[in-house]
Regions:
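Glycosyltransferase specificity loop/lid
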Residues: 1-101
């Protein structure tokens, strides 16, 4: 069995998956884990195959010059941009190595 995990590059998104991924790998499941490069050293010890994806948020950090006082209102839009940045690289890998889940 092959499972693909796609995670936003944030500790609150990655950390909860690590124990599950470790257990899946221990049970012989092949796991491909997509996340931003900064999480490679955290994900690789699980035994999953790590695939780095680009981060729109990292690439555009500090560009807008806008008032950051109402950041909560913009978070959903940031996540949409981040998901869009992931889409092509994730689909390219999965097209060649289709997961079961």
């Amino acid at each position: 069995m092959h499972i693909a995990v796609v995670s936003l590059g944030a500790f609150g998104h990655v950390n909860p998956t690590l124990e599950l991924v470790t257990e899946l790998v221990r049970r012989g499941v092949r796991v491909t884990y997509f996340c931003t490069e900064g999480f490679r050293t955290i994900v690789e010890p699980t035994g999953a195959q790590f695939v780095a994806v680009p981060s729109w948020m990292e690439a555009h950090a500090g560009e807008s010059g806008e008032d950051k006082s109402d950041v909560a209102a913009t978070v959903p839009f940031l996540f949409l941009h981040e998901a869009e940045a992931y889409l092509e690289p994730v689909l390219a890998v999965l097209k060649e190595d289709r997961p079961d889940a």
